[in-house]
């Protein structure tokens, strides 16, 4: 049950398991595409790697799972697919803009970008599909972006330039 986190943090986390390369692509207003890279060639762990996910895995946790799956660096195990939240939000604290000592005005969460796998597809609505599916306590419950009212549609962009991980096992043999 990982609802996500900060975009730059997940780029750095992914970098712990790959040498260098793209981690995620983001597209903002005007269809401007930006690729976020891990530029640190050091690898903290180069041994076997499994990513555990379920329907509650969303946003930044989907970026990590998708990137390591696209690199064929890790085997993703869990529910059929993750939450399917392929958007980046920023929180705007209204108290910073309107001074009112009587009560808390709250905040607005604004969607500013859509993110895409390095292989080009979005995780929006579809999530990250597990390589190996296992049942869990949420399997029978409809949870996900596709169950929300008026979700953004799934789409794809060109894939980023990346090389699959050349590691210790044949990825396809493990997941088939």
Residue ranges and their predicted role:
Residues 2-158:
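Conserved acidic, small-residue-rich alpha-beta core segments centered on
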Residues 159-176:
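Hard-cation-handling environments
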């Amino acid at each position: 049950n990982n609802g996500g986190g900060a975009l730059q943090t997940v780029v750095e986390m992914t970098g712990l398991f790959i040498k260098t390369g793209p981690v995620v692509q983001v597209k903002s207003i005007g269809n401007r595409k930006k690729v976020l890279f891990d530029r640190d060639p050091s690898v903290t762990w180069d041994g076997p790697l499994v990513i555990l996910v379920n329907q509650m895995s969303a946003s930044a946790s989907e970026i990590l799972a998708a990137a390591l799956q696209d690199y064929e660096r890790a085997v993703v195990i869990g529910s059929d697919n993750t939450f399917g939240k392929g958007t980046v939000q920023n929180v705007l604290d209204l108290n910073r803009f309107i001074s009112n000592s009587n009560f808390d005005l709250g905040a607005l969460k604004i969607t500013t970008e859509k993110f895409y796998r390095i292989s080009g597809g979005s995780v929006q609505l579809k999530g990250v599909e597990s390589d190996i599916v296992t049942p869990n306590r949420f399997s029978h419950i409809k949870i996900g972006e596709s169950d929300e009212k008026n979700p953004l549609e799934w789409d794809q962009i060109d894939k980023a330039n990346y090389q699959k991980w050349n590691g210790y096992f044949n990825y396809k043999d493990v997941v088939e």
